[in-house]
C-alpha cells in the first residue's frame, strides 16, 4: 500500500514535506489561453478543467518554483494528481519547460515530486509532444552539469515516469507507490502488480531507494549536498588500509621500489591525491547516513603488515575471508553514503556497490566498489552510470577493486558481459574528474582492470593483480598443481611487483 502520509498528498503538501518552514516561492510562465475545449475541441474538456480547478485550487497539474530543502536552494516541481490525474497537457509542458529553464538560469539543482497518469488524452498529440519538450529541457540541464532528483509518488505512470521520473539522475520512491510506464488500466490483465510498484522497480534496478515520507527531506538534503553543483573539487584521497581480523601488524615495511611508497607516517601518495582517513560505523543498506570521524594517514596511521614473500602468499592473503572488504572500507571512508542502485536496464549486482558519499569534511566522492565476487554485467553498467554521473557533476571518483574476475557463466554472456565491461573501460577513460583506485583484494584480469584508474592506482599489502589467476595459468601451460606457486611468482602479481612494474603508484600498508 502507498505511504499513508503522502500517497495522495497535494502538490503543495508534497513541497512542504521537503521544505518545511523554509518556504516556497511559486513561479508561473506567461499564460497561454487554450482554444475552446482544447486543441482537439474535446467536448466537456473546459468543464472538466473547471471542476479540477475548483476541487484542487490549482490552474494546472504542475506547480513549480524555488525553495530550500535542508540548507540547499533548488527548483521544485510538484504534480497535482487531483487535477486531471496529474496529466501532461500543453500548459503543463509550459510549466515544466519553464521550471527546467529556471534551474538552468540560476544554476540550481532540480527536484521533481512526480504523481501523474501520463499524457492528457483530451489534448491528443499536442499533449504527447510535451514529453519531447521535457526531454530536451532535461538534456540542457545535464549538459550544464546540474543535477536532477525525482521523487516518485503514487501513482507515477506513463510519459511522466518515462521523462521527469526515470530520466532523473537519482530516483527516489515513496513506499507502495505505483510506478511504471503502463498504468493500471492499460497493462495486461494478469500482469504481476509487484513489477509496477516502487519496491518492484527498486528490485529491478530502476529506483535508487524507497524512502519513507518522514525520511524524505533528510535524504533529499543529503543528495543535494553530494550532487552539487560543484566546482574544482580535489581528487578522492586514497583510503587508509584496514587491518585483517586477527592479524598482528608488523612495523614499517617498505615497498622495495622508488616508484612510490607511503610510510606509516602518511606523507601522501605519489599521485598527489593526498592522504586522509575516517573511521566510523554504519550499514551500506538503504539511503541512510553513516557516522564517521577522525583523521589519519593513507598508510593506516601506524604499523603496517608485512609484504607477501611469494606470489602464492599474495594470492592466499587476498582470498583470506578475514581480510577487510569493500563494506568496511566504505564505512571507514565516508560519513554519509547514498547508494545508486541498479543498472537502469532491469538488473542489479549485489556484489558491486555504487553511489555518492560525503566525507567527514563534507567533500563529496562517488564510489564504485567490488565486494570480492565475480562482477556481473549489471554491476559494470551500474559502475559506468555512476562514473559518468560523477564526471558530469564534477565529483571525484573512488574505485575499490576486489574481484576474481568478471562473471563468465552463460547468463552473463547473454546479458552482455563484453559490452558492459567495454563501457566501464570507456567511462573511466573519458572521465575528466580525477579517479582514484585502491586494490583491496583480488585483481582478477580485465574484470578488475575495468575499474582501475590509469596512473592513479594504489594497492594494499593484502592484494594482488594478475592477467590471469595462477591456477588457470598453470592449467593452460599444462603444469601440475604443485607448480602453481612458481607460476604465481612468474606472473609477478604481488603488491611490490605491481609498484615495480609501474602499474601501482604506492602500497597502502
Annotate each language-model stretch with its function:
Residues 117-235, 404-509:
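Conserved catalytic cores of soluble enzyme domains
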Residues 50-51, 56-66, 77-88, 373:
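Glycine-rich, flexible beta-strand/loop modules in the N-terminal catalytic cores of phosphate-handling
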Residues 139-143, 370-397, 415, 426-433, ...:
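A structural preference for long, well-packed, hydrophobic secondary-structure segments
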Residues 56-61, 87-98, 342-351, 375-385:
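Glycine-rich anion/phosphate-binding loops
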Residues 67-80, 95-120, 356-371, 379-408:
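A structural preference for short, pocket-lining loop segments at secondary-structure junctions
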Amino acid at each position: 500500500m502507498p505511504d499513508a502520509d503522502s500517497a495522495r498528498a497535494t502538490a503543495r503538501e508534497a513541497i512542504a514535506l521537503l521544505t518545511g518552514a523554509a518556504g516556497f516561492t511559486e513561479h508561473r510562465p506567461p499564460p497561454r489561453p487554450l482554444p475552446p475545449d482544447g486543441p482537439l475541441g474535446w467536448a466537456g474538456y473546459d468543464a472538466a478543467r473547471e471542476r479540477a480547478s475548483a476541487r484542487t485550487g490549482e490552474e494546472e497539474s504542475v506547480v513549480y518554483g524555488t525553495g530550500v530543502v535542508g540548507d540547499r536552494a533548488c527548483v521544485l516541481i510538484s504534480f497535482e494528481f487531483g487535477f486531471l490525474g496529474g496529466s501532461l497537457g500543453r500548459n503543463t509542458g509550459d510549466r515544466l519547460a519553464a521550471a527546467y529553464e529556471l534551474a538552468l538560469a540560476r544554476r540550481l539543482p532540480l527536484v521533481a515530486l512526480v504523481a501523474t497518469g501520463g499524457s492528457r488524452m483530451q489534448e491528443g498529440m499536442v499533449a504527447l509532444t510535451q514529453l519531447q519538450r521535457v526531454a530536451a529541457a532535461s538534456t540542457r540541464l545535464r549538459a550544464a552539469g546540474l543535477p536532477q532528483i525525482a521523487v516518485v509518488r503514487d501513482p507515477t505512470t506513463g510519459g511522466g515516469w518515462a521523462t521527469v521520473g526515470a530520466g532523473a539522475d537519482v530516483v527516489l520512491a515513496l513506499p507502495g507507490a505505483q510506478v511504471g510506464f503502463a498504468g493500471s488500466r492499460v497493462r495486461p490483465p494478469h500482469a504481476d502488480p509487484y513489477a509496477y510498484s516502487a519496491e518492484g522497480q527498486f528490485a529491478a534496478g530502476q529506483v535508487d531507494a524507497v524512502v519513507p515520507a518522514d525520511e524524505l527531506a533528510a535524504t533529499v538534503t543529503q543528495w543535494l549536498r553530494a550532487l552539487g553543483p560543484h566546482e574544482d573539487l580535489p581528487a578522492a584521497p586514497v583510503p587508509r588500509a584496514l587491518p585483517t581480523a586477527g592479524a598482528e601488524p608488523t612495523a614499517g615495511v617498505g615497498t622495495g621500489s622508488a616508484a612510490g611508497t607511503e610510510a606509516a607516517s602518511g606523507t601522501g601518495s605519489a599521485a598527489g591525491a593526498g592522504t586522509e582517513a575516517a573511521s566510523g560505523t554504519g550499514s551500506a543498506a538503504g539511503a541512510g547516513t553513516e557516522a564517521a570521524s577522525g583523521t589519519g594517514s593513507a598508510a593506516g596511521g601506524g604499523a603496517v603488515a608485512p609484504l607477501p614473500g611469494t606470489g602464492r602468499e599474495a594470492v592466499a592473503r587476498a582470498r583470506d575471508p578475514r581480510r577487510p572488504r569493500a563494506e568496511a572500507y566504505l564505512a571507514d571512508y565516508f560519513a554519509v553514503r547514498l547508494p545508486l542502485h541498479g543498472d537502469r536496464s532491469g538488473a542489479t549486482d549485489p556484489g558491486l556497490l555504487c553511489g555518492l558519499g560525503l566525507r567527514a569534511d563534507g567533500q563529496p566522492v562517488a564510489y564504485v566498489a567490488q565486494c570480492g565476487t565475480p562482477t556481473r554485467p549489471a554491476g559494470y553498467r551500474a559502475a559506468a552510470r555512476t562514473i559518468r554521473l560523477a564526471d558530469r557533476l564534477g565529483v571525484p571518483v573512488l574505485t575499490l577493486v576486489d574481484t576474481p574476475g568478471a562473471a563468465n557463466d552463460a547468463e552473463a554472456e547473454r546479458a552482455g558481459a563484453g559490452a558492459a565491461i567495454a563501457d566501464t573501460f570507456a567511462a573511466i577513460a573519458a572521465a575528466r574528474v580525477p579517479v582514484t583506485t585502491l586494490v583491496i583484494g583480488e585483481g582478477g584480469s580485465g574484470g578488475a582492470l575495468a575499474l582501475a584508474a590509469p596512473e592513479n592506482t594504489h594497492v594494499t599489502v593484502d592484494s594482488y593483480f594478475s592477467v590471469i589467476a595462477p591456477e588457470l595459468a598453470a592449467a593452460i601451460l599444462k603444469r601440475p598443481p604443485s607448480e602453481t606457486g612458481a607460476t604465481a611468482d612468474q606472473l609477478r602479481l604481488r603488491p611490490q611487483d605491481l609498484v615495480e612494474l609501474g602499474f601501482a603508484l604506492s602500497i597502502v600498508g
